[in-house]
Amino acid sequence: MSTENTSTAVAEEIPNLLITPSAQEYLGDLLEKQNTPGIGVRIFVENPGTPRAECCMAYSAPDEVNPADYKQEYSDFPAYIDAPSIPYLLDAVIDYNKDRFGGQLTFRAPNSKVPRVGPDASIEERITYILQSEINPGLAGHGGNCALVEVQDDPENGLTAVLKFGGGCQGCSAIDVTLKQGVETTLRQQIPELQRVVDQTDHTQAEGAYFK
């Protein structure tokens, strides 16, 4: 497999997306049935860096190629990767698993929902990045999640992050431990200017709580 930019633009990041041999075979057979010489697939992420991120794949005929895309050449077909999606496809794997019903194409992209933050990112963007990349993966094991509501500049307490918990965290009896020992500690270690973290969740609604 070779990777190249189909345009003359300088690459900030090179794709490391993996299409497994079984997925290559499946896609190659599928593309052959389209009767279009040179047809490939285009891979991109809709709503990248958000909880609504969705990894997508579409047919890409030669006359439909976006000149800014990155081309990964496989033995039977080319794959074109949307350049802005590359950071969100880091460590992504497209695989095909055969079963008694035929098989299923799977697309795992662990970084598709993780926001990207640069050195000039706002404190809101930095908090959201940490929540999405470090906090929520742990809470997901209990069916929970956490989101930033706002950052307040409190005259008495300084910069305060207001959070809201959902899923299995809402109404959970262990939420104070989760907030103080987990979320607040992690956020304040990485964002020193943050003075306080508070919970705005209505925990009287405990129907789906992990601990009651």
Curated annotation (Swiss-Prot):
This is Fe/S biogenesis protein NfuA. It comes from the Bacteria. Its cofactor is [4Fe-4S] cluster. InterPro entries: Fe/S_biogenesis_protein_NfuA (IPR017726), FeS_biogenesis (IPR000361), FSCA_dom_sf (IPR034904), HesB-like_dom_sf (IPR035903), NIF_FeS_clus_asmbl_NifU_C (IPR001075). Involved in iron-sulfur cluster biogenesis. Binds a 4Fe-4S cluster, can transfer this cluster to apoproteins, and thereby intervenes in the maturation of Fe/S proteins. Could also act as a scaffold/chaperone for damaged Fe/S proteins. Homodimer. GO terms for biological process: iron-sulfur cluster assembly; protein maturation. The keyword 4Fe-4S applies. The keyword Electron transport does not apply. Belongs to the NfuA family. GO terms for molecular function: 4 iron, 4 sulfur cluster binding; iron ion binding. Keywords: 4Fe-4S, Iron, Iron-sulfur, Metal-binding. Pfam families: Fe-S_biosyn (PF01521), NifU (PF01106). [4Fe-4S] cluster binds at residues 169, 172. Transmembrane segments: none annotated. Binds 1 [4Fe-4S] cluster per subunit. The cluster is presumably bound at the interface of two monomers.
